[in-house]
Amino acid sequence: MNEVRYYQKNIMIVDDDPDIVLSLQELFEREGFQVTTAENGRTCLVELEKGFQGIIILDLMMPIMDGIETIKKMTIDGFTDENTIIVLTAKRIQGEEFNEIYPYIADYITKPFDISTLLNTVKKIAQKPPVKRRY
């Protein structure tokens, strides 16, 4: 049986809902991923400054620093070059606000979400070697 190879094994879950964070952490750890968590954008940036590289599952509606502001700051600091962002949020955005973040995200999944859709999205991304992107 062929074992699936994951090039990106690190996942950061950035969400202020502890139930979602715990559920996703347990799911991805069972799948063999190393999971880091952050309760808002500011904490996410701290983890990135410590050297986190991988897949970031990011909510847009959070206190202290929301997801859109986090993506903007990640772009300025160069963190979008080596990390893959999946937006997972109840916030529906469009127009200019969406256009600002679209170039930097791999997928946009709305809450409530199907767990298998998120898991399959993460697995597809993780199976690809990381690409250093320049925007």
Label every PLM stretch briefly.
Residues M1-M12, S116-Y135:
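Non-catalytic signal-transmission and effector/linker regions of two-component phosphorelay proteins
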Residues L22-R30:
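Charged docking surfaces used in two-component/phosphorelay signaling
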Residues T37-V46, G67:
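Helix N-cap/capping motif at the beta->alpha junctions
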Residues V46, I68-D81:
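Short amphipathic alpha-helix used as the core "switch/output" element in two-component signaling
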Residues F52-I57:
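Active-site beta3 strand of CheY-like receiver
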Residues M62:
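Receiver (REC) domain active-site loop signature in two-component systems and cognate sites
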Residues E69, D81, R92-I109, S116, ...:
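Alpha4 helix (beta4-alpha4-beta5 surface) of REC/receiver domains from two-component response regulators
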Residues L88-T89:
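Hydrophobic/aromatic residues positioned on beta-strands within the core alpha/beta folds
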